[in-house]
Amino acid sequence: MDGRENDYQWAGPYLVSRQVIAVGAQSGIEQMSDLAGKTIAVQATGKPEAIFLSGGENVPAFRNVISLADRGVQYAMLDCGYVDAVAGHEEAIRQYMKDYGANFRILDEPLLTTGIGVAFSRHDTRGLAAQLTEVVAQMREDGSMEQLVGKYLEVPAHSLEVEQLEQ
């Protein structure tokens, strides 16, 4: 949703999405600044790639940013020690760790935290965004949203902390 709030009518945010950095469990890398001079792998065309290639003030000077079409390859590269870190969607990294027994550690500081919502045309007159927002609020209140998200994520509460986005 971020940066596109005025382009659409939005229902949400209803979930929190975090882009994070993962390193080997035994790595001495503790924060993003420790990645200066290191090699990181990212998925091509993803948010981490855009952030790292833009070189903002909080982005360390990497030795190399490797952009890959298949995110599974970036995880395998970290697992084999070919790169010092990977960056991507937190839940995708956690799922890889679970599925393959990978011993990664996710840095505490997220690279990007954003809300996920449902977009409707700005010109829509059916009131769907408002209706869906109301239904999602009811689902949050009665616990059914956590139950639903819990079918797909190990710790659904992290993804449901949308109130944190406004702080």
Region spans (language model):
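Acidic, polar ligand-binding/catalytic clefts
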Residues: M1-D34, R105-L111
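A ligand-binding cleft/hinge motif common to bilobed small-molecule-binding domains
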Residues: M1-D7, I51-G56, M77-L112
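Short beta-strand->loop
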Residues: Y8-V16, N64-I66, K98, A102-L112, ...
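Bilobed "Venus flytrap"/periplasmic-binding protein-like clamshell domains
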Residues: S17-G72, E90-R94
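A bilobed periplasmic-binding-protein/Venus flytrap-type ligand-binding module shared by bacterial periplasmic
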Residues: Q19-I29, G115-T133
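Short amphipathic alpha-helical coupling segments at ligand-binding clamshell hinges
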Residues: D34, H89, D124-Q138, S144-L148
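Ligand-binding clefts/hinges and TM-proximal coupling segments of bilobed small-molecule sensing domains
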Residues: K47-I66, A102-L107, V136-Q167
